[in-house]
A protein has these predicted regions:
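Extracytoplasmic/periplasmic solute-binding protein
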Residues: 132-147
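Assembly/oligomerization interface modules of large self-assembling protein complexes
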Residues: 21-83
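Long, contiguous amphipathic alpha-helices that act as assembly "spine/axial" helices in icosahedral shell
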Residues: 75-135, 204, 299-303
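N-terminal alpha-helical "arm" segments
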Residues: 1-26
Length: 322
């Protein structure tokens, strides 16, 4: 049966947004669980860190009050990127019922998933590729993975304005020793005033490698210490899991979404939604009304989204690139 533009338009009015939003929900979510996401209206924004971490000083009777000043840290600049997708319904598909209204709505649902997948791919590659300086994305663009300090997002030599270095990178397998090593990375972090950073991680993030997933779940939900032959008390799990977990679909991915086996056991600790891993969105994925090509009579249905992301300071996350 011939599918007219009018019929397609009516179907879109009733169902397209629902299908598109359902498609967005079907996409991965690991990156959005970690990054601090906010909406913006400007193409370019600047985010500075300020460290005001003073300690009151002893002052004698009638003495001058101690004075402290904030220390300005590093600046992270966001520039909005545009990402698009579309699909075409040809006149023949409509005319010979090869592409029904339901099929068209499935395509619109796929567009919703497409935008969500690209957002997640970029966010998660920002972590999975974060031990390097940059990578080339599927469009051939060079994407920086440097933090605002000019060092790799995850590095053994992250810098501060106080001139003191700290680390948020350690290659060690998941387990009791690994958790303690990464907790110590947090304990040793310093801010731009040179004082300790008071950040407690909330989540373990990791790839979907079954052996790693199962080890983490077993470790966090066992009353006994699964790494000890004597089965001592598991301090991370006997009162209930100390950390929540986030499975990241693209943590071990290449920029073209293929699997990178060298990153199969990547994991780390993170303060989810902390201020240092940032994502700014100026336009969430949207679907536009179909456009008819006057020369071909084909219908083109399009979507786009605009966002940027980056790492300011390295205080919120660690990475084990074992």
């Amino acid at each position: 049966m011939f599918l007219t533009q009018s019929e397609l338009g009516q179907a879109l009015v009733k169902n397209a947004k629902v299908a598109f939003n359902e498609g967005m929900k079907m996409g991965p979510t690991g990156g959005r669980q970690i990054y601090n996401i906010k909406m913006v209206t400007d193409m370019i924004t600047e985010n500075d860190t300020h460290s005001y971490d003073s300690i009151a000083r002893s002052t004698g009777e009638g003495g001058t009050y101690h004075t402290s000043v904030p220390v300005k840290g590093f600046r992270l600049i966001h520039r909005q990127g545009k990402f698009t997708d579309s699909f075409v319904t040809t006149k023949e598909m409509m005319m010979f019922d090869k592409y029904s209204v339901a099929d068209t709505l499935k395509g619109i649902q796929g567009l919703g998933t497409s935008g969500a997948k690209r957002l997640e791919l970029n966010l998660q590659l920002g972590i999975g590729m974060g031990a390097g300086a940059s990578y080339q994305d599927m469009d051939g663009n060079t994407v920086s993975t440097l933090g605002a300090d000019g060092q790799n997002a995850f590095s053994a030599t992250k810098t501060t304005k106080a001139g003191i270095a700290y680390s948020n990178l350690q290659a060690i397998a998941f387990g009791l020793a690994g958790l303690e090593a990464h907790q110590n990375l947090f304990r040793r972090m310093v801010n731009h005033s040179g004082r300790q950073v008071k950040v407690i991680p909330t989540h373990i993030y990791h790839t979907r490698t079954p052996s790693l997933v199962n080890t983490i779940e077993e470790f966090l939900n066992s009353r006994g210490n699964v790494g000890s032959p004597n089965m001592g008390v598991n301090v991370y799990g006997y009162k209930g899991p100390r950390f929540q977990t986030i499975e990241m679909e693209y943590l071990d991915a290449n920029p073209d979404e293929t699997r990178d086996n060298a990153k199969a056991n990547y994991w780390g600790l993170v303060l989810a939604k902390g201020q240092e891993l940032q994502c700014e969105i100026s336009q969430n994925p949207v679907v536009y009304a179909p456009l008819m090509d006057n020369e071909t009579r084909n219908l083109n249905i399009q979507t786009d989204l605009h966002f940027s992301h980056g790492h300011r300071d390295g205080f919120n996350a660690t990475l084990s690139n074992v």
